[in-house]
Amino acid sequence: MTDAPAQIVELARSRPRADGAPVVVGITGAVASGKSTFAAEVATAAGTATDVVSTDGFLYPNAELEARGLIAHKGFPESYDVDRLRVFVDEVHSGAPMVMVPQYSHELYDVGGEVPLTLRDDAMVIVEGVNTLGALADQLELGVYLDAAEEDLERWYVTRFLALCAEAENDAASFYRQFTAMTVSEIESLARQTWRSVNLVNLRDHIAPTRALADCVVTKGPDHDIVAIEVR
């Protein structure tokens, strides 16, 4: 299989844009599909002047989700500040020398704080998240969808959930600390229940339909190996 990250970089840089304007690449896919890892690989292939931004930072804070009655739908489209996300991409495209990026902590399970992002000439900004194409398809130079079988996605999610719970044994501030008194079997059962009642629903109802908006579909096999690349 052709080096997928390098192919994504080549495709993105071939897209029309104003001279010197940053290239914005969107990467989406289900929870646990490996978006962050793939985005990091694309950034490495692109070299310097490349940054990765997660849409998780554009989630509403937990307190606001609670107030709106949306905490059970965290990660669904309505739980994101899409206007703020779109303004961010506009600022990147505008040639601004610096933009602010809101941050998210998976350990704390909440947003918090911002960090500055310095944009250099011919920069590439990779925006990754479950809602990237749904929110930004018309603003991207290149939209990428990471595809995988549902049974593989569930297995990857459970593995990640178990790992986060194990790490929480030594981190009292971690959101996952609350599960550490449970047995591994109980944690795995909880993870599968969460996948099927929340993440699978989000995938089928909101994420998978955005596959049609992608310029490129990268299909993964059971071991996160890339088995196909479809360029549209």
Question: Model regions: which residues?
Answer:
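Post-Walker A helix-loop "phosphate-sensing" segment adjacent to the P-loop in P-loop NTPases
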Residues: 43-52
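Hydrophobic positions on the alpha1 helix immediately C-terminal to the Walker A/P-loop
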Residues: 38
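Short hydrophobic/aromatic beta-strand immediately N-terminal to the Walker A/P-loop
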Residues: 24-26
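NTP-dependent small-molecule kinase module
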Residues: 1-16, 159-162, 187-232
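Conserved lysine of the Walker
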Residues: 35
